[in-house]
UniProtKB/Swiss-Prot annotation:
GO biological process, any: one-carbon metabolic process
Record protein name field: Methane monooxygenase component A alpha chain
Complex and partners: M.trichosporium has two forms of methane monooxygenase, a soluble and a membrane-bound type. The soluble type consists of four components (A to D): protein A, comprising three chains, in an alpha-2, beta-2, gamma-2 configuration, is a nonheme iron protein containing an unusual mu-hydroxo bridge structure at its active site and interacts with both oxygen and methane.
Organism: Methylosinus trichosporium
Catalyzed reactions per annotation: methane + NADH + O2 + H(+) = methanol + NAD(+) + H2O; methane + NADPH + O2 + H(+) = methanol + NADP(+) + H2O
Length: 526
């Protein structure tokens, strides 16, 4: 049958002008911008002192369909590996006990950071006016929801497959009494969501993600693998695949305010404050968790810190922002000095107050001590002597009634909490750079440990009103505080925290009560 002239004409035209068989995502992204609309006013909760330009672009140009396809593929690989392959191999019980305890802290604390990053990214969406910039922030909101679930899933997985689930399965209610909890909230919550949206972007994207993502999320996979943990790398490396887009969002935030006069006036100060506050917590806490919470070491924390924070971020990353007037933080040099001893100083406080935690802490053994001395000359004569004395006095034995915190007080070594960072500090035993200084404001005394934090506090003392663990529990007996904070296992009497990783000789509330440890307020003497 002969075809019609119209059909023939159409066929000939298609031969010359082939119909498209697909559309590139970048073309769709460009087309979607035509559907943008102007907002009469931004609805952000807090005003910003910066003006974000209306023509700012998004580097990755993500569209919802491609984003969903990409993340679905990653989740299939991640959960498929965890729920099938690693479960069949019994991966949960191949983790060294010391590292399994460390992950009780890392995954739980990081979950809080990811959760608050949801709100931080949404605040930036509210503040931005450029359609592409809003699109980048929206994708990050979805990422942070995913990351929150992933961190929670690590604790869930450990709860089911690790031999000591206590701490993994109930840290959300127990963590509040811990001496490291309020400091974590300071960097992972207050800094991300409180106040100026652009300042929050500096805290989250420019410092938290661009600076500390690598020494946290990337480095932790190396330490985990070295200690038999295949669970954490499976999840955290999937998390890290999203972080580059978040760093790009921070870069675009800076680009969007580059021509704003407020940028020249405030940006470098905000960056320095954000960096110092975060490093004041992350530098000692991550070093302590990696080196003291592992059996098999990867490298000295000071080397990891120097590579990722000082060279990669402070030099290369911030250097790329130099054309927009951004400078490396003035406090970076002091932070570099902190990276050598600060985590060892914190370790003393963490071990001394172990009953308030939700993980089991084993003192460094002979092999650990040799490693510390080889990499931190002078460690043995200071920290090693204290740990060895504690062990002789019965640190691990519940019958001894020995609480290291009481030993510190009896020997004149008061533990203070830095008001700005909320990090514990023992000035009389510290080898780091800090020193104690005390101020009074609104009828309340405040301890501070360094020049940069003191400067921040003096400018805005009302911003740092959070009471610390000693003010909260002054005059209270330790076992009462533990019971009130649900720091016990399912039997209602055995502590979740323990001073060793064995299954015997477990401390109970009665053991703690016999010691008669009562919290004093160290600032009462001033």
């Amino acid at each position: 049958m002969a075809i019609s002239l119209a059909t023939k004409a159409a066929t000939d035209a298609l031969k010359v002008n082939r119909a498209p068989v697909g559309v590139e995502p970048q073309e769709v992204h460009k087309w979607l911008q035509s559907f943008n609309w102007d907002f009469k006013e931004n609805r952000t909760k807090y005003p910003t002192k910066y003006h974000m330009a209306n023509e700012t672009k998004e580097q990755f140009k993500v569209i919802a369909k491609e984003y969903a396809r990409m993340e679905a593929a990653k989740d299939e690989r991640q959960f498929g590996t965890l729920l099938d392959g690693l479960t069949r191999l019994g991966a949960g019980n191949k983790v060294h006990p010391r590292w399994g305890e460390t992950m009780k802290v890392i995954s739980n604390f990081l979950e809080v950071g990811e959760y608050n990053a949801i709100a931080a990214s949404a605040m930036l969406w509210d503040s931005a006016t450029a359609a592409e910039q809003k699109n980048g922030y929206l994708a990050q909101v979805l990422d942070e929801i995913r990351h929150t679930h992933q961190c929670a899933f690590i604790n869930h997985y450990y709860s089911k497959h690790y031999h000591d689930p206590a701490g993994h399965n109930d840290a959300r209610r127990t963590r509040a009494i811990g001496p490291l909890w309020k400091g974590m909230k300071r960097v992972f919550a207050d800094g991300f969501i409180s106040g100026d949206a652009v300042e929050c972007s500096v805290n989250l994207q420019l410092v938290g993600e661009a600076c500390f993502t690598n020494p946290l999320i990337v480095a932790v996979t190396e330490w985990a693998s070295a200690n038999g943990d295949e669970i954490t790398p499976t999840v955290f490396l999937s998390v890290e695949t999203d972080e580059l887009r978040h760093m790009a969002n921070g870069y675009q935030t800076v680009v969007s305010i580059a021509n704003d006069p407020a940028s020249a006036k405030f940006l470098n100060t905000d960056l320095n404050n954000a960096f110092w506050t975060q490093q004041k917590y992350f530098t000692p806490v991550l070093g302590y968790l990696f080196e003291y919470g592992s059996k098999f070491k990867v490298e000295p924390w000071v080397k990891t810190w120097n590579r990722w924070v000082y060279e990669d971020w402070g030099g290369i990353w911030i250097g790329r922002l130099g054309k927009y007037g951004v400078e490396s933080p003035a406090s970076l040099r002091d932070a570099k000095r902190d990276a050598y001893w600060a985590h060892h100083d914190l370790a003393l406080a963490a071990y001394a107050m172990w009953p308030l935690g939700f993980a089991r802490l084993a003192l460094p053994d002979e092999e650990d001590q040799a490693w510390f001395e080889a990499n931190y000359p002078g460690w043995a004569d200071h920290y090693g002597k204290i740990f060895n004395e504690w062990k002789k006095l019965g640190y691990e034995d519940p019958k001894s009634g020995f609480i290291p915190y009481q030993w510190l007080l009896a020997n004149g070594h008061d533990v203070y909490i830095d008001r700005v960072s909320q990090v514990p500090f023992i000035p009389s035993l510290a080898k780091g750079t800090g020193s104690l200084r005390v101020h009074e404001f609104n009828g309340k005394k405040h301890s501070l440990t360094d020049d940069w934090g003191e400067r921040q506090w003096l400018i805005e003392p009302e911003r740092y009103e959070c009471h610390n663990v000693f003010e909260q529990y002054e005059g209270r007996e330790l076992s009462e505080v533990i019971a009130e904070g649900h720091g016990v296992r399912s039997d209602g009497k055995t502590l979740i925290a323990q001073p060793h990783t064995r299954g015997d000789n477990l401390w109970t509330l009665e053991d703690i009560k016999r010691a008669g440890c009562v919290f004093p307020d160290p600032l009462a003497k001033f």
